[in-house]
Design a protein with these regions (language model features):
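Sec-exported extracytoplasmic/periplasmic mature domains
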Residues: 22, 26-33, 93, 97, ...
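Active-site neighborhoods of enzymes that stabilize oxyanions during catalysis
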Residues: 70-170, 174-182
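Active-site His/acidic residue clusters
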Residues: 1-19, 23
Length: 206
């Protein structure tokens, strides 16, 4: 969070990690069991540069005492008092750099389902915007995550190699929920019901 994705700090960190991985694999290749080991290198999410001029504090638009609970950040879930839901929705529709949905209108791509704990209003900031609902000062960081999971900036990395995996297979994109299925298969475990795609996962394995 302290550096933007395209900063010299991030570049030097990636180069440092690359050297560490190079040393790791060089030593791993000396092992008699190297050809039996599966390796996975991954990240949990992408990062996007935060632009302070796009900062949005919902405290400037909505009365705090009209909500029973607020889970703020990227995204923000609002739990307004029943008599205030419609008013809050109308106000949020006019706030720049954010999109708001009622609970029953949240796009399926976010996979929120119908859980009763979901806030009555789901507020998602644009890429590069940070959202808060609190009186204190603005956040101090250079980048963050949690935006639309279909945005390229939010894509993670995934590399796999070893006897279990096919060679030279490249997927255009893969949901991180598939990691559970991948690891379960490597460990020969029966996965519990989940949101992963077994068809996509099968394309990676021999």
């Amino acid at each position: 969070h302290k550096a933007t994705p395209d900063s010299s700090t991030t570049l030097s960190t990636v180069e440092h990690l690359d050297r560490i991985l190079g040393d790791f694999f060089a030593k791993a290749r000396r092992l008699d069991i190297f050809d039996l080991i599966d390796f996975i290198v991954l990240s949990d999410h992408g990062m996007a540069t935060y632009y302070p001029e796009n900062y949005v504090n919902l405290n400037d638009y909505l009365p705090r005492d009209s909500f029973d609970y607020v889970f703020d950040g990227v995204p923000t879930l609002l739990y307004p008092k029943p008599t205030y839901t419609d008013s809050a929705y109308a106000i949020l529709k006019c706030v720049p750099h954010v999109t708001v949905w009622r609970k029953n209108e949240i796009p399926e791509k976010f996979v929120y389902g119908k859980n009763p704990r979901i806030g009555d209003l789901f507020v998602l900031p644009d890429i590069g915007t940070y959202l808060q609902f609190r009186p204190e000062s603005r956040p101090i960081f250079a980048a963050t995550h949690g935006y639309d999971n279909f945005a390229p900036e939010m894509e993670a990395i995934f590399y796999a190699a070893g006897p279990s995996f096919k060679q030279n297979v490249e997927l255009p994109v893969m949901a991180n929920v598939n990691l559970y299925l991948i690891i379960a298969r490597l460990l020969d475990l029966q996965p519990a019901p989940n949101d992963g795609d077994s068809v996509v996962v099968s394309t990676l394995f021999r």
